[in-house]
Design a protein with these regions (language model features):
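N-terminal accessory beta-strand-rich subdomains and adjacent acidic, glycine-rich linkers
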Residues: 1-169
Length: 169
């Protein structure tokens, strides 16, 4: 991936526009968690490398690389309640990827559409949105599944350029 963008828009702030890095904090975590209601396993291994980037403007972005996944989240020191208007993630794949995605005709959907399979360059020309989760298969055989957690508004994905995915809430 190349020239990717991550940002967060609140009612009063745009975080991630011309970021100024203040501090970098790295941490390795390797712990065993005991689930409240154990189903199959009595412990869960929680192992990841964490990178916390603290920026000028009262916000940070935390990245976690697990053995089998990757996650990020925004943290803010902004005063009072903050209404999140939009979260932006622009991914620019260097090579054309095969995408596996649902493309409904509108926002009213029961998530029953069949998954379509098309390259990122074909999708760019279709000018259609897609829903998460979305699976991208790279020419090298890597698979990248993009999803979302803790939803109150459902994100959409659009293809703006040849190998560019724009995820917007």
């Amino acid at each position: 991936m190349d020239n990717c963008v991550i940002g967060l828009e609140t009612a009063n702030h745009q975080l991630g526009i011309h970021p100024k890095l203040n501090k970098v904090v790295r941490q390795n975590v390797n712990e065993e968690l005991t689930p409240i209601v154990p189903l199959k396993f009595s412990t869960i291994t929680n192992r990841y490398n964490q990178l916390l980037l603290k920026f000028k403007g009262g916000y940070s972005v935390e990245f976690r690389a697990f053995d089998d996944g990757f996650a990020y989240r925004f943290l803010t020191d902004l005063k009072g309640e903050q209404e999140i208007m939009n979260e932006i993630l622009r991914l620019n794949f260097v090579d054309d990827c095969l995408l596996h995605l649902q493309q409904p005709d509108g926002f009213k959907t029961s998530y029953e559409e069949e998954y379509r399979h098309q390259t990122s360059s074909e999708w760019k020309n279709s000018n259609r949105m897609a829903l998460l989760p979305l699976l991208a298969s790279t020419p090298k055989g890597d698979k990248i599944l993009m999803s979302e957690t803790n939803l109150t508004a459902y994100p959409i994905v659009t293809g703006k350029h040849k190998n560019h995915l724009y995820i917007k809430k």
